[in-house]
Design a protein with these regions (language model features):
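TPR/Sel1-like alpha-solenoid repeat signature
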Residues: 36, 43, 55, 62, ...
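Short coil/turn linkers that connect adjacent helices within long alpha-helical scaffolds
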Residues: 24-27, 64-68, 104-108, 146-150, ...
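N-terminal leader/linker segments that initiate helical-solenoid repeat arrays
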Residues: 16-70, 74
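Alpha-helical repeat scaffolds
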Residues: 95, 99, 130-144
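Single-residue signature of alpha-solenoid repeat helices
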Residues: 52, 92, 132-136, 174, ...
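TPR/TPR-like (Sel1-like) alpha-helical repeat modules
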Residues: 251-269
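Residue-level detector of the short coil/turn that links helix A to helix B
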Residues: 47, 87, 127-128, 169, ...
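Sec-dependent bacterial lipoprotein signal peptides
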Residues: 1-14
């Protein structure tokens, strides 16, 4: 709670002035919007969704003040991603479509493609979305050809393709797509997202029954999440490790992994998630 209050106070410092902006201040607004966007995305990657919304609400507000279409689109996409993670899918879809309309209106074909990729991911991860997997895979593959300048969005598109391949039961192709995403994240030192790539690769390997290699992938995810102190990622990695070890028949290692996950969740004040991890021990 104290962290949230401090964050609100820091946002209020930017929000209180209502005087007209001087011409030179527009560049300061852009810098502040970019800073809020970076922090919002980082908070989201660490599972701090409520804090992420505070940063991203401010990023959207500052982007509106600059009237910079590209900045407005990127801030809108990130905010919609968090809304989707919070279960507010209707608002998320509305936000993605607003960003898409902005991109189309300004003639930005690349950012329009980026918006469509996010919309496709939303379809795929919605209830019953697996029936659309082939259509989503084809749509994202077409849009990927239009994304040239932003490596982060290219990596994201490959991840969505991988998820679609997973839903189609093509686990080797799913991992190949995630490897394309992983290669970008590792080269760009984006270790939080590299950890998530390994987490997904582990899930693909587990689904295919290769529990030994799934464990290796989770060990890589844990190493990256430790490197960036992503406690949320670590808790999920260890819970997944418990699942994999249980499927492999190693009950002792499974229990240890679930217990470790629960300890991290509890340290994050996520008692429900901690209870879920412990409940899997004897399930």
């Amino acid at each position: 709670m104290r962290k949230i209050l401090l964050l609100i106070c820091s946002l209020l410092v930017f929000a209180c002035s209502t005087a007209p902006k001087k011409t030179g201040e527009i560049f300061d607004l852009r810098k502040r919007a970019e800073a809020q966007l970076v922090q919002g995305n980082k908070q989201a990657n660490h599972g701090n969704l409520d804090n992420a919304m505070l940063f991203l609400d401010e990023a959207v507000r500052l982007a509106a003040l600059t009237d910079d279409p590209g900045l407005r689109i990127r801030a809108g996409i990130s905010r919609s991603n968090v809304l989707f993670s919070l279960g507010r899918s209707g608002e998320a879809v509305e936000g993605w479509n607003e960003s898409l309309n902005e991109a189309v209106h300004t003639g930005d074909r690349e950012m329009a493609a980026v918006c469509r990729v996010h919309i496709s991911r939303g379809k795929l991860l919605s209830p019953g979305g697996n029936v659309q997997a082939q259509a989503v895979r084809d749509e994202v593959n077409r849009d990927l050809a239009l994304i040239k300048s932003d490596r982060l969005y290219i990596a994201f598109a490959w991840m969505v393709i991988g998820l679609a391949e997973r839903d189609l039961g093509r686990y080797a192709q799913a991992e190949a797509a995630l490897r394309r995403s992983l290669d970008i994240h590792e080269k760009d030192s984006n270790f939080e997202l590299a950890a998530y790539n390994w987490f997904l690769i582990a899930s693909f390997r587990s689904l295919s029954g290769d529990y030994g290699k799934a464990r290796q992938a989770l060990e890589s995810a844990i190493a990256f999440d430790r490197r960036v102190e992503n406690s949320w990622g670590l808790a999920n990695d260890w819970r997944a490790m418990g699942d994999v070890q249980k499927k492999a028949g190693d009950r002792e290692s499974s229990r240890a992994a679930y217990t470790r996950a629960a300890g991290i969740f509890r340290a994050l004040d996520l008692e429900e998630a901690a209870a879920d991890a412990l409940s899997r021990i004897d399930a």
